[in-house]
């Protein structure tokens, strides 16, 4: 199942999210916006299983990577749409 994965410019280029992803959804790409000169990218969101290990691994105060599960999460929790 595919999920929306967003990478924010608060990414510090640490690679923790990339290493945590069990389905290789994430990769690092060159970026001049941080000291590490790289940022996470999510080119294979169709492989995302929604485990959110990338979010858990992110060391920034504001999570630089977020997984949005969509309506199936709301349904599974029994909440109205």
Swiss-Prot record:
GO terms for molecular function: 4 iron, 4 sulfur cluster binding; electron transfer activity; metal ion binding; oxidoreductase activity. Binds 2 [4Fe-4S] clusters. Cluster 2 is most probably the spectroscopically characterized electron acceptor FA and cluster 1 is most probably FB. It is a peripheral membrane protein. Its EC number is 1.97.1.12. Keywords: 4Fe-4S, Chloroplast, Electron transport, Iron, Iron-sulfur, Membrane, Metal-binding, Oxidoreductase, Photosynthesis, Photosystem I, Plastid, Repeat, Thylakoid, Transport. Coiled coil: none annotated. GO terms for cellular component: chloroplast thylakoid membrane; photosystem I. It comes from the Eukaryota. Residues 2-31, 39-68 form the 4Fe-4S ferredoxin-type domain. The eukaryotic PSI reaction center is composed of at least 11 subunits. Apoprotein for the two 4Fe-4S centers FA and FB of photosystem I (PSI); essential for photochemical activity. FB is the terminal electron acceptor of PSI, donating electrons to ferredoxin. The C-terminus interacts with PsaA/B/D and helps assemble the protein into the PSI complex. Required for binding of PsaD and PsaE to PSI. PSI is a plastocyanin-ferredoxin oxidoreductase, converting photonic excitation into a charge separation, which transfers an electron from the donor P700 chlorophyll pair to the spectroscopically characterized acceptors A0, A1, FX, FA and FB in turn. This is Photosystem I iron-sulfur center. It comes from Acorus calamus.
